[in-house]
Amino acid sequence: MSKDIEKVLKEGCCSHCGSCVSLDSSGESYMIDTKYGPIPKFSSKSEFPSFINDACPSIGINYPDLYKYFYKNLPKNWLLGSIENVRTGYSSQKAIRKKGASGGVITQTLIYLFENKYIDGAILAKQGIPTPEKARAFIARSVDEIIDCSQSIYIPVSMLDILKDLNPKEKYAITCLPDQSASLRVLQKNMYSPALSIKYVIGPYTGTAIYPEAIRSFLRSKKVRDHDLITSLKWRAGEWPGYLEIKLQSGRIIRTPKVYYNYLIPFFITNTSLQSMDFVNEFADLAVGDAWSPKYENMGGGHSVVVTRTKKMEKIILDMISKDLLKLKKEVY
């Protein structure tokens, strides 16, 4: 076991990515739930490759080296990352746009990849597994399953531990946070076989995440007792920008506009959020974020900033635009 990773865990600095668990050749490591999010649990038989430290976001991923490997050069702008094109817009499909966290672009793109046989499955974060207030990585293998995983999730979800369960004969897309995308690229750089099954990385812009304890703290502020269990939780329900919706066993339903529950951030913000230097998913093929602009907020409906970072993804987005699957406007950057 890496002493550096042991120190990361001891100091409470784990980024919850799950990369180390996927690299354990013994197969005995797994992620456990804690009030500070998922963290790895290792066994005495755990064995890891020499590059494990390089892939750990909490130890620190060498972005300049990774840029030279993946993009073959350094970015012109370190705030924005490598870019093919920047656009704003949304899915042309009203139902997908409405169900998405912003403009439904990620969902629409995943459906396109699946229906056109670019992928056999999409690895997504899904709220409600194994219990309503928790979330897990999930492999969607149908359009309905992809749509069912729409929406944002603001608690840590380990996305890379599932790599060890992938079928080497299949192709996948994955949605993951910036630090997870970078870690995945390190795994690919080191020819880790399961990581090579990931053909497309589609990542959201990421500002802050909060620890799971924030949910119960919020409910206490609404006079909800701890024994009143959660039966459903949606972070961005309803029309964009959405509202937090929590349904309880008692039958009570609590809805709070997104901007109103942001007060939880200073008290429950994750260490990963505080440490992160990447908010725009620099190693995703496609990076998508909310278009937080008074212009778009007044229009309603949900709008996204859509950034293509690789030529293969630019080609896909252009095809989707030509087929009227996406309504996108090119922006100057």
Segments from the language model and where they lie:
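Iron-sulfur-associated redox domains of electron-transfer enzymes in respiratory
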Residues: Y63-Y333
